[in-house]
């Protein structure tokens, strides 16, 4: 008898700062478009799109670098995201598995979420984490923002297992969320090589979750002008 697995998506958001020599590209917009297209092509490759797929960080960097010889460097930061579907208006527990180890900065804020509302609490609520001193486990904390400063309203809203890559929320009555029908929960991975384990399927998000910043490499521009000057002497 065939067993049907409840497939869950593990989204990977990328934030890339790409330096380039503007003397070698037609327009900044054209370069940006080609970089996004290359990332999108990689996102659909068999490496990622399969059970047990793996997002290879070095491959992603290479994909960006190879778009144009004008690119001089790129710094790319990855984050993992699961979308939690709340049982609105009901007291419910939640479990989110990422199956990849979380980074555990002892100051916390390794986990971030979009906002939601809790019955009986005024204002928008967010969740984050605070690791225990061993960095292996920790707690989930709920907070609101007062003048852009976190105001913690629950310091024991759940547990975090940084090694397993697992978040558990204790019983909570979520009444609404800022994003339709879901709460996006983003985590910093310990390794930038992200593997689809268990019933997870990796999606390299090339839409709203990912960012691209293009920076003119002034050093390479100066070098190019210098070489051109030397050539004409």
Regions found by a protein language model. Name each.
Residues 1-51:
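Carbohydrate-recognition loop of C-type lectin domains
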Residues 12-14, 53, 107, 114, ...:
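Structural beta-strand/beta-sheet cores of well-ordered domains, especially the beta-sheet scaffolds
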Residues 30-123, 127, 203, 222:
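An aromatic-glycine-centered, glycine-rich loop/turn in mixed alpha/beta architecture
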Residues 46, 124-180:
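Extended, beta-strand-rich, solvent-exposed assembly scaffolds of outer structural proteins
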Residues 85-97, 157-202:
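Polar, low-complexity export/assembly segments characteristic of proteins
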Residues 194-221:
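Acidic/polar low-complexity flexible segments
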Residues 224-231:
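Conserved small/polar residues in nucleotide/adenosyl-binding loops
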